[in-house]
Amino acid sequence: MNYENILQFKGTWRVYQARVLDRVEHYVRDGKIHIVAAPGSGKTTLGIELIRRLQGTALVLVPTITIREQWIARIKEAFLCDGVNAEAYLSQSLKNPRAITVTTYQALHSAMTQIQDGEEDYQGFSLFQVLQDAKVDTLCLDECHHLRSEWWKSLESLKEKLIDVTTIALTATPPYDSTPAMWNRYIAMCGEIDEEITTPELVKEGSLCPHQDYVYFNYPTKQEEAEVMRYMQAHPDCEELDPEIEKHLANSLGKIESIRQITQHEYASLHGRLHMLILTDYIRKEHEKSIGNREADVNLLGVLPLFENLRRDAQDMWSDMRLGVLCGSIIVIPAGVKDALLKTVGDAGMVTFSKLGSLPETEYVKVSAVGDSHFLIPAVTQLFADGYIQVLIGTKSLLGEGWDSPCINSLILASTVGSFMLSNQMRGRAIRTWDREPDKTSNIWHLVCLKPWYESSFGTKPETSEDYRMLTRRMEHFLGLHYTD
């Protein structure tokens, strides 16, 4: 496929992007190009240019529908030549492939197994025949390690059937900390890593903002410490804590106090310029009824308990800090920004507002969509960027939908995730540059519960706690200055 007068990059290549592109002929000798590019490096843009240079008829596979749409949008905005009909060369449907067809791994699996998915019915559909007829000779895999087991099988089956196909593999988060078997499976699919674009060089080039990681330590609460001491007295010969207790301490209520203090500090420093994101593991929907009830106990790590803790703090300090909740099953905004939300939504959909807990509807409200709600997350994200919300609370699953907001300048990781892949995804949301604030810097806060009783009781150091080891795993593959070396 000759892309002359069809696709041409309209921008200027960064130094690190040009370095990769200058070596394409060397990388492609084994039929596979495998690029590791930190979040914010223009990974999608590189992928499109590689397809253009290889002059391939390409099938691009991505993790989610959101990312699929981002690929198509990027091609149109940054590559498509003036006067070219996009529909003639771009497709999001396996049933109607074009020069570049972008689809999800889920759709691939549905087509390979000939079942009906949410968008299309693949019963009786011969994907391999369609791809052969379309002369697909380039397979571009975006973050292919984000796959369920059955998706892996479908991808491997497709790859076996496609002959003389060049593979382009793009990722920000290689599964470095996976099992040897998983790593070997990944490398067999993508090939050995050809080039890595690192975070420090992206900061140097101005593609990512300067940022600092902080570790905020806390001790367990008195109640948690008493629970541990009871366990130790009942098991005097035990050399380590029960895994359930370790898990309990990883979700220590002391971390709630840490989050409160960090939030107060950041808001005192930035006020209306604060764009803080707090990511946790659970929503804790059962605590919705506690919101607005001062007598209710909300000491639990989760989206809604954290929201209520911070709401009470803001109320007690007469602070005008505005909070928001952004999750798939619940969205909360300040009541005073309802009109701004409606204006942002426009004709994209219909919105309703309802009471949150026992709060008066003049403070905070829940937001729901009438019918399809796909437009709500982008709309609330826009409110966040526009400063109507200073602190946004959500779960890590939000990232799986390809969510992003370059305005974030403070991130609290209130999650027990220790894997490099997910940690890098979360951390990457805070270090992007933002056009509205060219001098943006960002803080990333990691929470760790220590055990002050450990050294005297078990003869080991406090940092041997599972929570501390999780932090070590999380940090292991991040590049930065070492404290001593």
Regions found by a protein language model. Give the residues of each.
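Walker A/P-loop
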Residues: 29-50
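Post-DEXD/H (motif II) to motif III coupling segment of the RecA-like Helicase ATP-binding lobe
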Residues: 146-211
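Conserved RecA-like P-loop NTPase helicase motor core
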Residues: 109, 314-318, 324-483
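SF2 helicase catalytic motif II
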Residues: 105-108, 113-169
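Conserved C-terminal RecA-like helicase domain
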Residues: 38-41, 45, 69, 84-101, ...
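Conserved pre-motif I regulatory segment
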Residues: 1-36
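Conserved helix-turn-beta segment of the N-terminal RecA-like "Helicase ATP-binding" lobe
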Residues: 66-93, 187-190
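Conserved Walker A/P-loop ATP-binding site and its immediately adjacent core
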Residues: 44-49, 53-77, 106, 151, ...
